[in-house]
């Protein structure tokens, strides 16, 4: 018998790659266990109790990933398990995509670590948000599109399937369409003469169809809300589908009437925030970019006519082993989300996470640049990881003496468990003015009969009669009135009811939840929250 061939030796960089993936996953698991639930997460986890093809704010992807809450309804870790699985799968798909792009094992290792260590990667890998299913579908769509651009045009169908799944996670997945078109025109324009890209679009539409049908049945509720939210426009939700209590308030952009200078500053602010998502890694990245340019043009006396800046930048970011399809997809996937939301930022406020998917393609595109300073990039990545780890620890303990502006995580998470225990014993119907208070108290007290009183603040899924029964003021009056939980001292007038009394609760960092009384000193000097419990009773009959 011929001698058995020894198995091929595994590149040490490949071992480091899979070790990095394992360590990243373990860190995310620990952070998900340590970090208390945040307000929007509690809202999404509540959706999982009533799965549907759509919700007031988003399509159903985030609710589906939250079904771990069925195992332990008051556990943040259980509620995040689906998110953790999807986030880990996203990194695995990205490894396959980066390998297909032509990156070496060393580059794959560096790019994986940097991608996961951006602030976007660290946060989205832990928190249960719609961005997680969106990122997974985006990565899958990029992988399939690359194969299609290289000649197997049938893969536009699978890219379309991934796009449809992404649309079921978050409507921002629609931006992949222009990215694909840009890449096709650059790398394979003849594909537009074949049926495959169009079959891919049809596949996306078919997968997305259940949510479209849900929107049709609910007067385009979620799409109208998101369009108004994204572009600061008044979309109006028809009373036919949702009732008058669901009519959305008029939206006016703070940039309305602004001059060119203010709009330009808004765009620059948006781009600055996107750069800040790199955290400490932005500094070695700039050094690597400078070294790339300096190596390209070491002679400072060279005429600009022979070394245009655009050519030097193109060489700096694309001198790796990227073929035309890979380069087209990476450039389009990076520039289109940034350019699109930069344009939106000139007219309407843009949240930092809306364009965050540009990082999935920007990082491998900049692999040659980062390769000039790999140790510095890894050290900066560890710095980001340490910074977020300390912040997660602070969210759990509140031990760090941070200024008020840096205490947002405590405002998001602290005291709600005690609040839920307090309001669970109140007699009579209970409502809150904001959906966040409803979600947090229902998370910590599963089954708590609390709803959102309509017309006071932004409407939510709680007013649709799915998660909670629709509010019937007549039935509430027959019950003798209700309690209203609010974080505002303002007492809204509610037709048919008057105020009988109120209680004030202080959420103190060290002392916990304490009730305040007019004739006694305040329970603490700087509470994280003040919550009012206002008792409304029916107006006396005429």
Predicted regions and their residues:
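Membrane-interface transmembrane helices that cradle and orient dolichyl/undecaprenyl
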Residues: 9, 99-105, 141-156, 319
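Short acidic/glycine- and proline-prone juxtamembrane loop motifs at membrane-interface regions
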Residues: 120-134
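Short helix- or helix-capping micro-motifs
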Residues: 21, 108-119, 143, 163, ...
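Hydrophobic/aromatic-rich transmembrane helices and adjacent perimembrane loops
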Residues: 51, 280, 335-338, 347-375
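Transmembrane-lumen/periplasm boundary regions of multi-pass, lipid-linked membrane glycan transferases
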Residues: 176-297, 322-325, 337-339
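Transmembrane alpha-helix segments characteristic
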Residues: 19-25, 163, 285-286, 294-302, ...
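Membrane-proximal, lumen/periplasm-facing interface regions of secretory-pathway glyco-
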Residues: 351-352, 376-426, 435-451, 455-465, ...
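Transmembrane-helix motifs of polytopic, lipid-linked glycan transferases
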Residues: 18, 81-103, 117, 140, ...
């Amino acid at each position: 018998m011929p001698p058995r061939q020894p198995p091929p030796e595994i590149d040490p960089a490949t071992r480091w790659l899979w070790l990095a993936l394992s360590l990243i996953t373990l860190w995310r698991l620990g952070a998900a266990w340590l970090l208390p639930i945040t307000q929007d997460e509690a809202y999404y986890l509540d959706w999982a109790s009533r799965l549907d093809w759509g919700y007031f704010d988003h399509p159903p992807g985030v609710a589906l990933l939250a079904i771990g809450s069925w195992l332990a309804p008051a556990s943040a870790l259980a509620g995040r398990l689906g998110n953790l699985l999807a986030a880990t799968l996203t990194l695995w798909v990205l490894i396959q995509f980066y390998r297909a792009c032509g990156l070496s094992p060393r580059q794959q290792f560096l790019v994986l670590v940097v991608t996961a260590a951006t602030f976007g990667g660290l946060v989205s890998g832990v928190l249960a948000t719609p961005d997680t299913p969106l990122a997974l579908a985006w990565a899958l769509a990029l992988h399939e599109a690359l194969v299609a651009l290289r000649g197997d045009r049938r893969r536009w169908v699978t890219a379309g399937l991934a796009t449809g799944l992404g649309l079921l996670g978050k409507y921002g997945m629609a931006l992949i369409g222009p990215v694909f078109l840009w890449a096709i025109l650059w790398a394979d324009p003849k594909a537009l003469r074949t049926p495959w890209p169009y079959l891919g679009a049809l596949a996306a539409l078919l997968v997305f169809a259940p949510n479209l049908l849900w929107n049709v049945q609910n007067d385009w509720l979620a799409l109208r809300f998101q369009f108004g939210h994204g572009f600061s426009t008044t979309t109006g939700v028809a009373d036919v589908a949702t009732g008058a209590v669901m009519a959305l308030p008029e939206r006016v952009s703070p940039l309305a009437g602004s001059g060119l200078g203010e709009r330009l500053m808004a765009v620059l602010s948006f781009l600055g925030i996107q750069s800040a998502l790199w955290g400490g890694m932005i500094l070695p990245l700039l050094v690597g970019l400078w070294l790339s340019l300096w190596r390209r043009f070491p002679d400072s006396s060279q005429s600009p006519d022979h070394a245009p800046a655009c050519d030097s930048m193109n060489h700096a970011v694309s001198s790796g082993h990227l073929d035309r399809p890979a380069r087209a997809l990476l450039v389009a996937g990076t520039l289109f989300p940034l350019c699109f939301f930069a344009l939106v930022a000139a007219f309407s406020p843009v949240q930092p996470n809306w364009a965050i998917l540009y990082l999935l393609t920007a990082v491998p595109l900049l692999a040659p640049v980062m390769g000039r300073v790999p140790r510095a990039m890894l050290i900066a990545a560890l710095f980001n990881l340490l910074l977020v780890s300390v912040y997660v620890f602070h969210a759990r303990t509140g031990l760090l003496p941070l200024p008020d502006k840096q205490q947002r995580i405590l405002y998001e998470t602290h005291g709600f468990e005690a609040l839920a225990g307090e309001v669970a014993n109140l007699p009579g119907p209970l409502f809150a003015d904001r959906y966040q208070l409803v979600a947090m108290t229902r998370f910590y007290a599963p089954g708590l009969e609390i709803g959102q009183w309509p017309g006071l603040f932004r409407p939510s899924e709680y007013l649709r009669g799915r998660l909670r029964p629709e509010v019937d003021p007549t039935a509430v009056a027959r019950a003798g009135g209700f309690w209203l939980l609010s974080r505002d001292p303002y007492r809204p007038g509610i037709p048919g009811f008057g105020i009988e009394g109120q209680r004030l609760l202080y959420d103190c960092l060290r002392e916990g939840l304490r009730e305040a009384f007019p004739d006694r000193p305040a329970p603490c000097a700087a509470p994280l929250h003040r919550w009012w419990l206002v008792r409304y009773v029916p107006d006396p009959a005429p």
